[in-house]
């Protein structure tokens, strides 16, 4: 019954799926040597719009993926305990502002670098998630396709943010050095429930961070238009 309900809730997403696969314009912009450039052929404003579009779609699909996973694999009592499962979000230690007042006070430069840190911190965990989902019995193709799509689009978003940093700040790419050892270490043969709760935490945390990426980028866009009206 839970599987049927989850599939019904996801039917509208199936209709939207071809659009999601084609609507987002690629953010890659490389020179003849294959190195990311300043993208002289596209304006800073249009590039920022494309980056925001990618972030919006990534958040939307991550929300759908988390809901689908929850419906299919998480009993309701455990849904209430997901924050007590002993798996903190992997980006918890990153120096990224969380409150509205903190976000309002940071510079455009730090807004961009905060987005880049979040994006880079999630690339490997999402690849890891795709491998762990194969352990599940009856995992729907819809969930596998969504996680794969998000993983690929996140790498595209990274490229777009890097080019945006080059354009707006005239800076080179920075790489986030963050260890996911606490999340990915193999504790022998964990129970299936432990796998499920760990992956559920991963999806929930990514959904939250994907929303934060979108918020930060939209604040940056607002500042470009009218600094005093941004809240």
UniProtKB/Swiss-Prot annotation:
Q: Name one GO biological process term.
A: response to nutrient levels
* Keyword Glycoprotein tagged: yes
Which InterPro entries does this one have? 4_helix_cytokine-like_core, Somatotropin/Prolactin, Somatotropin_CS
**Family annotation (PROSITE patterns):** SOMATOTROPIN_1 (PS00266), SOMATOTROPIN_2 (PS00338)
Pfam families for this protein = Hormone_1
Which UniProt key words apply to this protein?
Answer: Disulfide bond, Glycoprotein, Hormone, Secreted, Signal
User: Where would I find glycosylation on this chain?
Assistant: 145
So which tissues is this one expressed in? Pituitary gland.
Q: Which family does it belong to?
A: Belongs to the somatotropin/prolactin family.
Q: Which GO terms describe its cellular component?
A: extracellular space
- The positions making up the signal sequence are 1-24
> Where does this protein reside within or beyond the cell?
Secreted
Disulfide-bonded cysteine pairs: these are 29-39, 89-205, 222-230
Q: Which domain of life is it from?
A: Eukaryota
Q: What is this protein called?
A: Somatolactin-1
- Major location category of this protein: secreted
Q: Give the species.
A: Sparus aurata (Gilthead sea bream)
**GO molecular function, a single term:** growth hormone activity
